[in-house]
Regions:
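Residues at the starts of beta-strands that form the adenosine-phosphate
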Residues: 2-4, 31, 92, 125
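N-terminal beta1-alpha1 ligand-phosphate binding loop
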Residues: 2-25
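FMN-binding flavodoxin-like domain, especially the glycine-rich phosphate-binding loop
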Residues: 17, 48-187
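A short beta-strand-loop structural module common to alpha/beta enzyme folds
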Residues: 29-41, 130
């Protein structure tokens, strides 16, 4: 059986840490080793039908990358390398985003929504969604109809809640991702 691909962008290493925690919860038999998008080519991501993608928040809620002030290549540069005719139809994706609700309350985890919208525009099925309860912020582009588009982690302010949030979220998305891997693929 194909594995769930885990890919992330990071500037400080925190998104990588969370990606590794997710893989540990899923197990190596189910989930591939997390890979940084600044070290791979699009074909490596596109080879997976079930994906978990992680992003930090950066700038004023843009997709992280050089134009948002990142020193290293991130999602912005990776997405620019995707084929012009890319289609993510048939791919099921769960997302997680990092943010700092006290420091950036007016745009908390907004980069997650930007990545979500790009992937959905390419035809991906996004699974997950996450409640806003337990977070304190003024505004977030990542909130749609009263819920985050997917998991949000605030390692800076609420690091003590990360493990419990990951446990609950993995339990929610794992069966949906595995179901995608067990479906027969079109030729």
């Amino acid at each position: 059986m194909q594995q769930i691909g885990i890919f992330f962008g990071t500037e400080t290493g925190t998104t990588r840490l969370v990606a590794k925690k997710i893989q540990a919860r899923l197990g190596e038999a189910i989930a591939a080793k997390p890979l940084n998008v600044n070290r791979i080519e699009p074909a490596q991501l596109l080879a997976h039908d079930a994906l978990i993608l992680g992003t930090p928040s950066y700038g004023v809620g843009q997709i992280p990358g050089h134009s948002a002030g990142c020193l290293e290549s991130n999602w912005e540069e990776f997405l620019a390398k995707m084929p012009a005719d890319v289609s993510l139809r048939g791919k099921r994706i769960a997302l997680f985003g990092l943010g700092a609700q006290e420091r950036y309350a007016e745009r908390f985890a907004s980069s997650l929504r930007r990545l979500h919208d790009v992937l959905q525009g390419w035809g991906a099925e996004i699974v997950g969604g996450w409640p806003t309860e337990g977070y304190t912020f003024e505004q977030s582009a990542a909130v749609v109809e009263g819920r985050f588009v997917d998991l949000v982690i605030d390692q800076r302010t609420q690091g003590m809640l990360t493990d419990a949030r990951l446990d609950a979220w993995v339990a929610q998305v794992q069966p949906l991702l595995l179901e995608c891997l067990q479906q027969p693929q079109a030729a």
